[in-house]
Structures are given as C-alpha cells and as structure tokens.
C-alpha cells in the first residue's frame, strides 16, 4: 500500500507570493503529493534581516494564499516554537507527530539547496525527508553543488505516481517554469505605491492593503477595491 506523500514548504513568507505557490505546484505534480503543508518560519538562521511583518500577519497571508486549495494547509509549528527555525528540528517534529506514517517531501529552490552544506544538522537532515529541489530556467543546480558523495548518491528522477518506494531518502530534481518573483521585489513595489496584483493572490493583496503592511498605500489597486 502506497504511503501518503506529504509536501513541506518552509519559508519566511514575507510576504508569500505566486513563486512560492508555483514551486509547490511543480513539486506536487512531479511527485503526486497527497497534501502540501506550508510552514512559516519564526526566524530563519541564514536570513540577514528580520521579517518585516509580524508572525501573525505572515501566517495569515499564507493561510489566505491557500484558502481555495483543499489539500493544502498552513502549520504554525515553527512560530509556536519561536527562536531559530531549523529544518532539521521541524522535520524531526513532523516525524514525532501525526505525520509519522507519511512520506515527507521537503520542497526548496535550487538557490537554497546550493547552501545546504551550511545547514544546521547537515548531513543528517538529508535522512529525515526526501528533498525536492525546484530548478527554474536560469537557476539550475551547478554540478559543483552536487559533488559531495552524500548528495550525488541520493539524486534520482521523480518517481511515478503509483510507485511505492522505501529505503534511503532521495533528492529529486524537478524542472519547473516558476514565475520570477521575490518577497523583496514585492516589498519594494509596495513601498513605492506600485501594484502587486500579478505577484500575489487577491486575498493576500487585500490583507496587505487592509493592514498597510510593507508600506502599502490605500490606492494599491487603484479604484478597484472589490478584491
């Protein structure tokens, strides 16, 4: 019997945007995931600056972004834990909770994966979940980033939807055409009074405008205030 496949997408989500959703969609399609859980970070160790929005708003924005996706949800486990948000601790927490029977697939971009050797708990963290690395055009993983034996030996093409597999955790490289957008870009546009309609979901844009997050102004969407 095939175990449930649970996709995990972590991040500061400051704010969450269509690029995050594109990455999770690509992973979900390639790995036939049964469910996707977004986990906003309280404080990412490798992030230079503090999040601009509070944990409340970042969680709310993530929840609004997936509101119309029945098999997606948002977990507050890292926000409740507070302090530094380490992937190793989060994955261990999932194993110790009700997700023990599921296969875990940790979704991340190729840029984040390139620095995985500096992660807390490396290389042991690789044994806690399958890693799904999203490669978008112009951002493929460099061959040098895969030279380490513990990475090279795990790399594998995505399994078929009906394939049941156990054993060592793998690293799946998924090529995807995700939209080129970043949270930094969105914050800069908001601070300049520019629209972000194509960069975030309508519900996310409305919440940002309502609470004046990231310097958003009242006329963010011009005269159309219905969204």
What is the predicted function of each stretch?
Residues 1-227:
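Nucleotidyltransferase catalytic core that binds NTPs
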């Amino acid at each position: 019997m095939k175990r449930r496949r649970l996709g995990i997408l972590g991040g500061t989500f400051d704010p969450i945007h269509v690029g995050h959703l594109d990455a999770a969609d690509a992973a979900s399609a390639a790995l036939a995931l049964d469910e996707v859980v977004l986990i906003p970070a309280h404080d990412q160790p490798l992030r230079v600056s503090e999040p601009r929005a509070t944990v409340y708003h970042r969680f709310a924005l993530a929840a609004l972004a997936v509101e119309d996706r029945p098999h997606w949800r948002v977990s507050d486990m890292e926000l409740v834990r507070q302090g530094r948000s380490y992937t190793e601790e989060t994955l261990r927490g999932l194993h110790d909770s009700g997700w023990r029977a599921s296969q875990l697939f940790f979704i991340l971009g190729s840029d984040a994966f390139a620095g995985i050797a500096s992660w807390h708990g490396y290389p042991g963290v690789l044994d806690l979940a399958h890693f799904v690395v999203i490669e978008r055009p112009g951002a493929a993983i460099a061959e040098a980033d895969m030279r380490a034996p513990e990475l090279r030996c795990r790399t594998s093409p995505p399994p078929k939807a009906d394939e049941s597999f156990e054993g060592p955790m793998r690293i799946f490289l998924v090529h995807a055409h995700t939209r080129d957008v970043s949270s930094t870009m969105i914050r800069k546009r908001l601070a300049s009074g520019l629209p972000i309609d194509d960069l975030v979901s309508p519900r996310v844009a409305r919440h940002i405008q309502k609470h004046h997050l990231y310097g958003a102004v009242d006329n963010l969407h011009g005269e159309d205030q219905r969204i």
